[in-house]
Amino acid sequence: MKQVFIDANVLVTVVNKKYPLFSDAAKVLSLADRSEFELFTSPVCLAIAFYFAEKKSGTSQAKVKLKLLLDHIKITRVDDKIVRQALNNAAIHDVEDGMQYYSAQSSGCTYIVSEDKDDFYFSEIKVVGCKEFLQTCL
C-alpha cells in the first residue's frame, strides 16, 4: 500500500475546481477509493483549503467540501514534536512546509503530492506533482 501525503495546494485546487490542474488533482484524490492507496493530509492543509474554499463558496459550502474530503483522506498529527522538528531543522526556511513534511513522515508517507515541489527542497520523501504521481503510480 502506498501512503501519500496531499499538500494544501492540491486540496485547494479540488475544492475550488481550479483549472487546468483540477482534473489531475481530482484523479489523485479519487485514488483514496482504491485499496492500494492511503491518502493523508494535515490539519494545517485542511485549514488552508477551508480558507480558500470559504472565500470562494462561503462558510457553509466550504464545510461541506471539507467533510467530503475527510470521508476519503486521513489526517496526520501535528503535535509538539512535529512543530519542534520543523523549527529545529536549519535547512527548513518555511515552518509550515516543515510541519507538513514531518507530519507526512510520521505517518509513513512515501510520497508528497504538491504542485509546489520546490517548497520541499529539503525532503527525503519523494515529492511529485499530480500528473507525475498519476504517471508513476498507476
Question: What is the predicted function of each stretch?
Answer:
Residues 3, 72, 105-138:
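Acidic, PIN/NYN-like endoribonuclease modules and their adjacent C-terminal/linker elements
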Residues 47-50, 70, 87:
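Amphipathic alpha-helical segments within well-ordered protein domains
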Residues 1-41, 54-61, 134-138:
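Short, well-structured N-terminal submotif of metal-dependent ribonuclease cores
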Residues 11, 46, 83, 119-120, ...:
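A generic structural signal for short hydrophobic patches within well-formed alpha-helices
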Residues 26, 53-74, 81:
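Active-site-proximal, substrate-binding regions of enzyme catalytic domains
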Residues 40, 76, 128:
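General small-molecule cofactor/ligand-binding pocket signal
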